[in-house]
């Protein structure tokens, strides 16, 4: 885990050097797409399959179809839960979130169950089209095209799970039903674009292959536009789950042939992985590891609540690069037996390192240019502003 304020050079000093070590596969959160532009070509020369999954410019992205990884009703429910994101819905009454979940469950299940839907048509665009068919018109239930489609599916398969889920919602009064439909449409309006429809029409990523061959997946996310957060969260949730299932069911010793490391920048802001507090405790045995990048520990608590403590405890290494949150500074001060004032005013370009079983120590941050020179790697093609060393004369001696 890496904790540091904006501008602490977390990407330059931690993510980039680890990425360029070229050990195993990587799944990297890439705000603005800079990492892909800087290092994509280099990784190709090192034998990597390089994948650009862009939620900023979906028209330039490889295709990703979440429904391609759904085969059970449990996976359907997980997909719906991530997309609805009950914890951040803002609904005081759980009835509305539960209704949205059941409706979305029924739509996804219909696409997977219906014999008239071709495999190539099993995508998110088909779900949105079904949602548009749910209007009842003049408040008459039988006027709903979706209702009739569900009835037809029930005639074909009396045990249809899609039909059962839909009936749970369809039994609502007309006014309530229409509100559920309108709320669901509004929730997914930001995803209803031609570019996303093209990107999600089929799947080119092949998640399992990430654990089979050296692959670098750059997940481009916006640090200002949060409209794609649900899809981003879904991708990370599905990727971790699929790799764990593959390791458990098909790999020797339940370990991936190629280790996979996730670099999750701005983790607590745009990524809320389903059951991550449980997952992080178990993924290590499958040769899956995670580097979480945060601005503060309180930021993690805001997203994960009490589960944040479990996540922190399961990280063997903590790199603290300094920030302005007094609560986080106090927590770090207790760990290294320093005052909160000392931690809040630690020198620029230094970090405290905490490793399980070792005494904490302070060190100077790695300079990326020195690392590139040592490894004889061509410097970044993207020009950057000169970073002047501030307060260099005040940096304390390194502790060993």
Predicted regions and their residues:
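P-loop NTPase motor domains
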Residues: 3-288, 303, 338-362, 380-400
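Short secondary-structure boundary/capping segments
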Residues: 42-43, 67-68, 306-310, 334-337, ...
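Catalytic or ion-translocation cores adjacent to nucleophile or general acid/base/metal-coordination motifs
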Residues: 292-294, 314
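Conserved P-loop NTPase catalytic core
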Residues: 306-331
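C-terminal alpha-helical "lid" subdomain
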Residues: 370-384
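Conserved H-loop
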Residues: 295-299
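Short beta->alpha connector loops at strand-helix junctions that form conserved
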Residues: 53-54, 294, 322
